[in-house]
Design a protein with these regions (language model features):
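Internal acidic/polar
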Residues: 1-5, 86, 93-117, 122, ...
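Short, charged helix-capping/linker segments at alpha-helix termini
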Residues: 1-4, 16-25, 35-54, 156, ...
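C-terminal edge and immediately downstream basic/flexible tail or linker adjoining helix-turn-helix-like DNA-binding
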Residues: 2-4, 14, 113-114, 119-126, ...
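Sigma70-family region 2
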Residues: 16-17, 43-44, 54-71, 90-93
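Structural recognition of an alpha-helix C-terminal capping motif at a helix-to-coil junction
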Residues: 36, 50-57, 70-82
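DNA-recognition helix of helix-turn-helix
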Residues: 58, 74, 81, 85, ...
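Arg/Lys-rich amphipathic alpha helix in sigma70-family domain 2
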Residues: 61-68, 78-97, 113, 165
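A short pre-motif secondary-structure segment
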Residues: 134-138
């Protein structure tokens, strides 16, 4: 039985051989995780949906450039990342990052959760784009260091360094507002 990575390569090969329907399983497999990443990077569901769709279109149009030794997810994530950064560059002040800190119970609990969410979003926005990206990929998408490195195109050591710096900065910021 083929693993996901091998299945992806077979599907890409079929697409390159003219079977465009072979791209559909790739979309089905990766649409949700890519959309979730775009939503976290952009803070806007509409922009995330547009960016995700654009990433799939560009991936399909450029399948011939896919290195079959690389994971398809890492490759298409790079395309999505570029799409998201283009959106961010074209924006005025950044929309808040969605952070799921939902509370259950009373309206007071919901209000408190909203306040915490806003404070954490502000802290995340205080990070550099590189730091915020690795935090989102590691803690919200739960990618491994190797997967983050492949997705962002930087060495694993750089990923770890950015993550360490981001965690240190977040600890300071969250301590200042009494969230840790």
């Amino acid at each position: 039985m083929l693993n996901t990575s091998d299945e992806d390569v077979v599907l890409v090969q079929r697409c390159l051989a003219g079977d465009s329907s072979a791209f559909e399983p790739l979309v089905e497999r990766y649409q949700r995780p890519l959309y979730n990443l775009a939503t976290r990077l952009l803070g806007s569901r509409d922009e995330a949906l547009d960016s995700t769709q654009n990433a799939f279109v560009k991936a399909f149009e450029n399948l011939a450039s896919f290195d079959q030794g690389q994971k398809f997810f890492s490759w298409i994530y790079q395309i999505l990342r570029n799409e998201c950064f283009n959106v961010l560059r074209g924006r005025r002040p950044s929309a808040p990052l969605p952070v799921d800190l939902t509370a259950s119970g009373t309206p007071a609990d919901a209000f408190e959760a909203d306040q915490r969410r806003a404070l954490v979003q502000a802290a995340l926005l205080d990070l550099t784009e590189d730091q915020r990206e690795v935090v989102l990929l590691r803690h919200f998408t739960e990618l491994s260091y190797d997967e983050i490195a492949a997705s962002t195109g930087v060495p694993v050591k750089t990923v770890k360094s950015r993550l360490y710096s981001a965690r240190q900065r977040l600890a300071v910021l969250l301590a200042e507002i009494n969230l840790v």
